[in-house]
């Protein structure tokens, strides 16, 4: 499911553009990611501490893009809840998750919100964002190393044709 792209449009858009198959596949992967996040938090929360392995467990299976999408939906669905840090709330609102209303006016995104304690979800989100930033930094260092100019041997100057001592 890591290679399946996240469909970021509502069902109405998918219906109008004949993309319902992509929407449904992405929505199923989002629901599976939500369940994986809940299981990871449940399995890795011990002694008032959330192990960083929880993030690795989810990201290896779903990738950062889908994990961030589900976490942004979770925070945006509870924008009234101050147990999410202001930084994470601002990040989630910047993700611009569109409303996905059904025929009765219910936002379908509510079914994709993680159902763990908001403090633990906030901690999981912070750890995920930190892991992503570290991975991006590693990637940029690798790119810099690849782009280093090749060193060339120094050229002998035309003026220094005197014999060496």
Predicted regions: what they are:
Residues 1-164:
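Gram-negative host-targeted secretion-system effectors, predominantly Type III and Type IV
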């Amino acid at each position: 499911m890591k290679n399946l792209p996240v469909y970021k449009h509502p069902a109405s858009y998918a219906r109008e553009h004949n993309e319902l198959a992509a929407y449904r596949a992405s929505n199923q992967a989002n629901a599976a990611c939500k369940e994986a996040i809940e299981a990871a938090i449940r399995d890795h929360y011990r002694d008032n501490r959330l192990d960083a392995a929880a993030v690795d467990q989810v990201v290896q299976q779903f990738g950062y893009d889908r994990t961030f999408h589900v976490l942004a939906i979770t925070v945006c669905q509870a924008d009234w809840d101050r147990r999410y840090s202001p930084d994470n709330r601002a990040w989630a609102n910047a993700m611009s998750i569109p409303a996905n209303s059904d025929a009765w006016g219910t936002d379908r995104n509510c079914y994709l919100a993680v159902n763990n304690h908001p403090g633990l979800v906030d901690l999981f989100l912070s750890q995920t964002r930190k892991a992503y930033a570290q991975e991006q930094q590693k990637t940029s260092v690798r790119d810099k190393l690849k782009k280093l100019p090749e060193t060339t041997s120094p050229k002998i100057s035309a003026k220094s044709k005197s014999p060496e001592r």
